[in-house]
Amino acid sequence: MARQTYNYHVTHFVTSAPDIRHLPEDTGIEVAFAGRSNAGKSSALNTLTNQKSLARTSKTPGRTQLINLFEVEDGIRLVDLPGYGYAEVPEEMKRKWQQALGEYLQKRQCLKGLVVLMDIRHPLKDLDQQMIAWAVEVGLPVLLLLTKADKLASGARKAQLNMVREAVLPFMGDIQVDAFSSLKKFGVDKLRDKLDTWFSEITPQQADKDDDPSIGE
């Protein structure tokens, strides 16, 4: 099937949900964005969609406590998962977030890809590795975006990229690693290309046909 290209600039907010049970129907295709509270996840979504405030950026990390859904077009959604790993969030709340994240990654059938964002200077913290492990466990492809890449000189950036690529080999999953900078618009094309690929693998129309037993009888 030929790969489609999508216009991410028309992406719009649909709804927020505290957990998987409150999400809309499990149809179409979703790609989720996950990352530590200060990894630049909201900034990356805003850069991708060319909208300054699609995903709210907060000066106080850890504010995104809900699963936020955005629609690119009918049946094609980007999902902003709760930021994790912020020290000042109470333990009970942390546990709830991690449970919601794990449940979403492992049970949401329309989820077709996971983007994990990590500060290029501090990659692969324990919770980042947990997200990757959950995704690989269910056969989900992963794009690791090393954010804030403008903070490092070219040589150091390449060294970090190579280090992370080596470090994720033991996960044995479909994992791609790229550098990204919202500030310099660095890596946006690669992100867009990967999303186009994931969203083109099965169209919502095909998904509906697959679900309808009367078709093809």
UniProtKB/Swiss-Prot annotation:
<dbReference type="InterPro" id="IPR030393">
    <property type="entry name" value="G_ENGB_dom"/>
</dbReference>
<feature type="domain" description="EngB-type G">
    <location>
        <begin position="27"/>
        <end position="201"/>
    </location>
</feature>
<protein>
    <recommendedName>
        <fullName>Probable GTP-binding protein EngB</fullName>
    </recommendedName>
</protein>
<feature type="binding site">
    <location>
        <begin position="180"/>
        <end position="182"/>
    </location>
    <ligand>
        <name>GTP</name>
    </ligand>
</feature>
<keyword id="KW-0132">Cell division</keyword>
<dbReference type="InterPro" id="IPR006073">
    <property type="entry name" value="GTP-bd"/>
</dbReference>
<dbReference type="InterPro" id="IPR019987">
    <property type="entry name" value="GTP-bd_ribosome_bio_YsxC"/>
</dbReference>
<dbReference type="InterPro" id="IPR027417">
    <property type="entry name" value="P-loop_NTPase"/>
</dbReference>
<feature type="binding site">
    <location>
        <begin position="62"/>
        <end position="66"/>
    </location>
    <ligand>
        <name>GTP</name>
    </ligand>
</feature>
<feature type="binding site">
    <location>
        <begin position="147"/>
        <end position="150"/>
    </location>
    <ligand>
        <name>GTP</name>
    </ligand>
</feature>
<feature type="binding site">
    <location>
        <begin position="80"/>
        <end position="83"/>
    </location>
    <ligand>
        <name>GTP</name>
    </ligand>
</feature>
<feature type="binding site">
    <location>
        <position position="42"/>
    </location>
    <ligand>
        <name>Mg(2+)</name>
    </ligand>
</feature>
<keyword id="KW-0717">Septation</keyword>
<keyword id="KW-0342">GTP-binding</keyword>
<feature type="binding site">
    <location>
        <begin position="35"/>
        <end position="42"/>
    </location>
    <ligand>
        <name>GTP</name>
    </ligand>
</feature>
<dbReference type="GO" id="GO:0000917">
    <property type="term" value="P:division septum assembly"/>
</dbReference>
<dbReference type="GO" id="GO:0005525">
    <property type="term" value="F:GTP binding"/>
</dbReference>
<dbReference type="GO" id="GO:0046872">
    <property type="term" value="F:metal ion binding"/>
</dbReference>
<comment type="similarity">
    <text>Belongs to the TRAFAC class TrmE-Era-EngA-EngB-Septin-like GTPase superfamily. EngB GTPase family.</text>
</comment>
<dbReference type="GO" id="GO:0005829">
    <property type="term" value="C:cytosol"/>
</dbReference>
<comment type="function">
    <text>Necessary for normal cell division and for the maintenance of normal septation.</text>
</comment>
<dbReference type="Pfam" id="PF01926">
    <property type="entry name" value="MMR_HSR1"/>
</dbReference>
<keyword id="KW-0460">Magnesium</keyword>
<keyword id="KW-0547">Nucleotide-binding</keyword>
<keyword id="KW-0131">Cell cycle</keyword>
<feature type="binding site">
    <location>
        <position position="64"/>
    </location>
    <ligand>
        <name>Mg(2+)</name>
    </ligand>
</feature>
<keyword id="KW-0479">Metal-binding</keyword>
